[in-house]
Amino acid sequence: MYRRDFLDAHGIRFLETPGASYQDASFAFKVLAAAERAVFLSEPIVDYRQDNASSSVKSRGKAFAVCDEYAEMLRWVDASGMDDECKGILTRAALRAKYDSYMWNYVRIAPELRAPFLERMADEYRESISSGTFSLEDLAPWKRVNLREIMRDLHASYADAGRLGRAGHYLRLGGPSVLAAYLRSRR
């Protein structure tokens, strides 16, 4: 639950998207970035539905809506009036979260949407890196080698689903040290 005056004071609104696709992403980011304090509950109060017949991951228009959510996060940070240091921290945090969201989306979208989705992902990260708002070093080692490979060759194989498929992929891309970092993160 949110106080309306808090949302209004910080210009926090849901981004309008087809079928409310991914709307929670930028809303939650903005709320957490603007909040001075928060209370979290351990019991679930939302029933999160995914992968139904008209799911975001099955529609070309909706599959790319996640990209609009991350663009909205960056727009909001830029317009926030925060000092440059705070903007930099929040921008990097959004771009780290974006990697995870994009990869989550990638494995769920229809196969025919995967190549165009990775192309957009690669273009967005190339721009962020060239503008200096993001560095591959901001990512964990296995994510870093994976994103580097996506930007290098969109058609290179991505990790097979499941822990073993990803482990083999990270070993191939980054060697034993990257595999070890990935496995340590999964404990």
What kind of region is each of these model predictions?
Residues M1-G61:
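Conserved nucleotide-sugar donor-binding catalytic segment
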Residues A25, R49, T91-R92, L139:
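Residue-level signal for alpha-helical context at structural boundaries
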Residues I12, A35, F40, S55-S56, ...:
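Gram-positive cell-envelope targeting signals
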Residues D84-A93:
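All-alpha amphipathic helical-bundle segments outside canonical DNA-binding/catalytic cores
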Residues E43-D51, V57-D84, K98-S131:
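Catalytic core of nucleotide-sugar-dependent glycosyltransferases
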Residues V107-R187:
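Membrane-interface aromatic/basic loop that binds lipid-linked glycans or pyrophosphate carriers
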Residues M1-Y2, K30-V31, A94-Y102:
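Solvent-exposed aromatic/hydrophobic patches embedded in short alpha-helical segments
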Residues D24, F29-K30, A53-V57, Y70, ...:
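Charge-rich, low-complexity amphipathic helices
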